[in-house]
């Protein structure tokens, strides 16, 4: 059976050198990777944090989680990705997404499909050393290293199809229910077919929400909570979450009141949505997802609301080192 590779989201919630030390702590705890969120409004740059983390670690996979080509021009992103690959050869990838907090902070909407298609194409061409036209200007990336792969973080069906068509790989936030994963893979395959590829050509990392607690009631608590006023927890970071919950048999309106979800129903939704409860239960649920759906590469996304978005995942790293790691056989 394939070993499950596990990375974890780390926010820029501390001074940069402390974040690098925390990345080293994650490596020692047994994680395969760390993704540092790219929110320029935080006042701390994700790529500087990743560069320092690269110097503090030996084999940890490092990537932004995630960068928006709306906020950072594709040439800037390509240069940053190339630089990070130079510092940590073979340990990096570039992950891009339409944007949420980062685009909102500059007063711009999320990127649409065409914008992301063009941006990913430009990024891959630049990283391959090819010339790309920006308006009347032809530009080429100099001082290249080996090209890092470009992953698209996709939540909705059409964005998942785009990942299958134009990206080197996909980060999918579709929950853990087998029906949801099957549906998402069908869309990934649609995109892959357009480009003459198969699913086997596209590495997939599943973005999995993790909410630790003494028992599984914590899952229902998160499901019945708000991310911020007017935005249910289940609709963060994308309302597309509700699309995949429908595949799992749960009908929720985009503007639903989470507090009105019956508690027993909330427990079921939590089990389809992510990993909730004790470390032992979370590990067993992840093993179940591997057995049912072949989930073998995950990016843990610690559950949080807007106010808690910069809290460091201390408890999650501790639980992984003490319990989850050995239970997964990592």
Question: Where are these predicted regions, by residue range?
Answer:
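Acidic (Asp/Glu)-rich catalytic clusters
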Residues: 23-28, 50-61, 81-92, 164-165, ...
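An alpha-helical appendage that flanks or caps ligand/catalytic pockets
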Residues: 2, 109-141, 181, 186-292
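Glycine-rich, proline-tolerant flexible connector loops at the mouths of alpha/beta enzymes
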Residues: 33-56, 68, 100-102, 175-178, ...
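Hydrophobic faces of well-ordered beta-strands that scaffold small-molecule active sites
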Residues: 4-10, 34-36, 61-65, 92-96, ...
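Short, acidic/polar
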Residues: 14-26, 77-80, 154-165, 279-289
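Active-site mouth loops of central-metabolism enzymes
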Residues: 4-17, 67-74, 144-155, 210-213, ...
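Alpha-helix-loop-beta-strand connector modules within alpha/beta enzyme cores
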Residues: 47-67, 71, 119, 126, ...
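N-terminal beta1-alpha1-beta2 module of alpha/beta enzyme domains
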Residues: 1-65, 148
């Amino acid at each position: 059976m394939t070993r499950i590779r596990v990375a974890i989201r780390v926010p820029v919630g501390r001074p940069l050198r402390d974040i690098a030390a925390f990345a080293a702590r994650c490596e020692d705890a047994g994680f395969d990777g760390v993704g540092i969120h790219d929110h320029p409004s935080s006042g701390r740059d994700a790529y500087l944090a990743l560069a320092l983390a690269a110097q503090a670690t030996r084999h940890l996979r490092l990537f932004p989680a995630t960068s928006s080509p709306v906020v950072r021009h594709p040439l800037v992103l390509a240069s940053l990705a190339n630089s990070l690959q130079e510092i940590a050869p073979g340990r990096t990838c570039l992950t891009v997404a339409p944007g949420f907090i980062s685009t909102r902070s500059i007063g711009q909407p999320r990127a649409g499909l065409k914008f992301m298609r063009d941006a990913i194409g430009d990024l891959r061409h630049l990283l391959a050393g090819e010339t790309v036209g920006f308006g009347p200007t032809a530009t080429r990336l100099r001082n290249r290293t080996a090209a890092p792969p470009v992953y698209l973080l996709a939540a909705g069906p059409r964005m998942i199809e785009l990942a299958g068509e134009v990206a080197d790989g996909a980060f999918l936030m579709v929950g853990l229910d087998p029906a949801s994963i099957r549906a998402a893979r069908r869309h990934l395959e649609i995109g892959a077919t357009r480009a003459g590829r198969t699913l086997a050509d596209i590495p997939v990392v599943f973005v999995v929400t993790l909410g630790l607690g003494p028992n599984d009631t914590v899952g229902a608590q998160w499901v019945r909570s708000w991310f911020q006023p007017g935005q249910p927890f289940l609709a963060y970071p994308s309302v597309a979450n509700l699309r995949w919950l429908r595949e799992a048999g749960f009908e929720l309106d985009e503007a639903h009141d989470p507090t009105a979800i019956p508690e027993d129903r909330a427990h079921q939704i939590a089990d389809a949505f992510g990993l909730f409860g004790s470390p032992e239960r979370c590990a067993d649920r992840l093993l179940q997802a591997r057995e049912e759906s072949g989930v073998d590469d995950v990016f843990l996304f610690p559950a949080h609301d807007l106010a808690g978005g910069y809290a460091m995942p201390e408890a999650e790293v501790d639980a992984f080192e003490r319990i989850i790691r050995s239970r997964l056989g990592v």
